[in-house]
């Protein structure tokens, strides 16, 4: 089995006939239906899914063989995966979150800062969560200005660290 990509996770049930609520990780949430059948994380079970609607940012779908609420409830937390080759080809400046996680984050001076541990979208755009070395974390907007270079093959990206304004509640150094 080649590389796979997580495209969603079942987060709950919808109604009494076995429909599920899915948090989709596809660009357009309803597009998860185009990748049917999807697999569980182990790759041991395939699910044919049919998108029937969307509610509050979640996809409502039916799965073949799941016909009641109890069966759907048992799937809560199941991650849905597809083979990477089934995804559309990306533009040169597009990346999957899974491609970014684990990359070495370097400063513009080439100094190693840490490792990308997560990518999140809080509504205002993608944000890289970088585990700094030797300790700490840094959140960086995933924009051309903040991340001017991404080298997937080389396993690295270049980060312009954000400049933080001092917290007005912080103690002033050098004071009495």
Swiss-Prot record:
Recorded superkingdom: Bacteria
Ranges where the PRC barrel domain occurs: 92-165
Pfam families per record: PRC_RimM, RimM
UniProt cross-references to HAMAP family, sorted A to Z: Ribosome_mat_RimM (MF_00014)
Record comment regarding domains: The PRC barrel domain binds ribosomal protein uS19.
Subunit text: Binds ribosomal protein uS19.
Task of the protein: An accessory protein needed during the final step in the assembly of 30S ribosomal subunit, possibly for assembly of the head region. Essential for efficient processing of 16S rRNA. May be needed both before and after RbfA during the maturation of 16S rRNA. It has affinity for free ribosomal 30S subunits but not for 70S ribosomes.
Protein name: Ribosome maturation factor RimM
Organism: Paramagnetospirillum magneticum (strain ATCC 700264 / AMB-1)
Lineage: Bacteria, Pseudomonadati, Pseudomonadota, Alphaproteobacteria, Rhodospirillales
């Amino acid at each position: 089995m080649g590389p796979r990509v997580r495209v969603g996770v079942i987060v709950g049930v919808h109604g009494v006939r076995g429909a599920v609520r899915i948090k989709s990780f596809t660009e357009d949430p309803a597009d998860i239906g185009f990748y049917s059948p999807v697999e569980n994380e182990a790759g041991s079970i395939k699910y044919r899914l049919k998108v029937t609607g969307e509610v509050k940012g979640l996809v409502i779908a039916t799965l073949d063989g799941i016909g009641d609420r109890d069966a759907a409830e048992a799937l809560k937390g199941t991650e849905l995966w597809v083979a990477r080759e089934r995804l559309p080809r990306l533009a040169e400046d597009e990346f999957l979150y899974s491609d970014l996680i684990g990359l070495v984050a370097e400063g513009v001076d080439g100094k190693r800062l840490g490792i990308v541990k997560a990518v999140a979208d809080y509504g205002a755009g993608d944000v890289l969560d970088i585990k700094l070395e030797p300790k700490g974390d840094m959140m960086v907007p995933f924009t051309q200005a903040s991340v001017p270079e991404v080298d997937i093959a080389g396993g690295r990206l270049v980060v312009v660290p954000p400049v933080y304004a001092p917290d007005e509640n912080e103690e002033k150094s050098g004071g009495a």
